[in-house]
Amino acid sequence: MKAHTLFLIILVYVGALSGLQAQHGKQQRADVLFTNFSFVKAADIYKELIEAQYNEKYAHRRLADCYLMLRDPEKAVKHYRQVIDQQKVANEVYYNYAVALRYLGDYEGSEKWAKHYKKQGGDAKLVRALKKDQSTYLPNEPIFRLKESNFNTPNSDFGAFKHGDLVYFVSSKERDGVSQKTYSWNEQPFLDMFTINLATNDSIPTAVAGEINSRYHEGPMTISRDGKTMYFSRNNYYHKTKTKDKEGVNHLQIYKAEYLNGQWTNIQDLPFNNDNYSVSHPALSPDGKTLYFASDMPGGFGKSDLYSVSIHDNGSYGEVENLGPIINTEGEELFPFVNAEGNLFFSSDGHPGHGLLDVFGTLKNDKGVLVEVTNLKSPINSNRDDFSFFMAEDGLSGYIASNRKDKIGNDDIYEFETILPLLLKGIVTDSINGNPIANAKLVLTKQDGTPIADLTTDVNGYYQHSIQREQYYNLAASHPKYQDRLTLFNSMDIPSKQTELVVNIKLVPVLDLKVLADLNTIYFDFDRYNIRPDAAKELHKIIDLLTNQYPNMTIKVESHTDSRGSKSYNDRLSIDRANSTYEYLISNGLTKERVIAHDGYGEHRLTNGCSDGVHCEEPDHQLNRRTDFTVIKME
């Protein structure tokens, strides 16, 4: 029977953990969608997590962020209110809440929470911008980690595009064994396209095989998912003929190539190219049915706009369409890219940003309609040119290019990793028997004591909370039956793809049997030593505790009397009470070695002032007619 019961307990426990893992998988998927700017899809999953009552505070906050990004302040405010009044809230939430309230016209409320954000150490510049209606919502924390690529050359490098194990990129480095013309703009060789094979860990670039590279500029490029088709930019140089407009300018054009027998060949001119303006920077939609590009063709909004054109099944093209004023400005919009979720990214010097060209993402509502663009912030953007954004299909890594190092005329390629939210989780257990501890209280703070969250373990001893990376933390655990414990840990240098940090905690039981067994005091009737029914109930708690939870614990029995009667009589009576207690424990399952002593102390250890000669009521005397238990050993 016991084995069967234990099996059921284990089954329920494992099932509960499996359910939690499944919910965490959902949360991770939602977080990836969020960092990929797929806010509608992410919102749907966060709503599911809320319905499942999984990590609700976090899910409400993220759902509110999604709605704010989607410019739905009513729904954003609704979900911010689910977390805003809690004791420990990330400071960024106050700012986002202030932004949402301002969108609704609640200027008084917006100012209140903006001041609260500033008071908690928030950026005063953001508060000032909010008051001037110049704020644009941005993700709360940096969502990318950046490092310089190991295949940069001393020349200009940009336009990285990964397909399979190959990274294609554009560079003004010289091609081995090829005599190249020099571009008078910067006195470097004309741009060509190169590849790096990530599978071989070889950082030496190789020129793209085939007919792509010419005497003039090539790149950047985009490749279809099946790897058979490339669209790339090149100077207007086709069939070895260089064409200029009437002003003598040789513009950029987009060409199509096929991959055959390990070579890029069959170069084709596209029908919407024009000798009088540039068409460049191609980007394909995930399904390969739409081509995006940049052009300075007449009729646009600025110096260079972004356009799209449909690609038909027969290989023909539809009408070229301008992407409109939400994306295009009076400045330059360049280097479009569409990620696996269908979200458009691009570079612009016309939208508010950090410097010259900045990288922006686009936001769509639940109907798929473009509603806004948002700056990707630092570290993607700097005070210099930042462009040619590329994101891998998994949404967790990619490349950009930048001249942020102030190398005149030179651009470098940077690799980025998406920083997914980190989930702190663990199980609090008994250090003696390994059993999970339910209702343990956990206080999570930063190293400097800044409060983050108050947590409570569930029936399986499990806890979780989302935390920031690159931080040091304190985690204080407490429970009435256990000694307090402070655990120090950190989230430094954790790989970007790792989304969980496990901190398990073992608590040492207190050496107090009354506390451990939830024991009520065992009392005796006046001048009696028999075990009363209420006392028997308490003794069975002790038997259960020592049998099922602490099989190596040993205890001592200590019995007492009130002060009525002679001291010698009471000494004898207390011994009888100790003996009856001991015999009850042994006769009901405890072995003799578990109770190492059972002693009587007569009236020598009264719990109150009811000694000889002091008038006390019966309830007061009752408090002294008792048996206590002392833990001698716990292993």
Protein language model annotation of sequence segments:
Residues 3-9, 19-635:
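N-terminal targeting segments with Sec-dependent signals, encompassing both cleavable signal peptides
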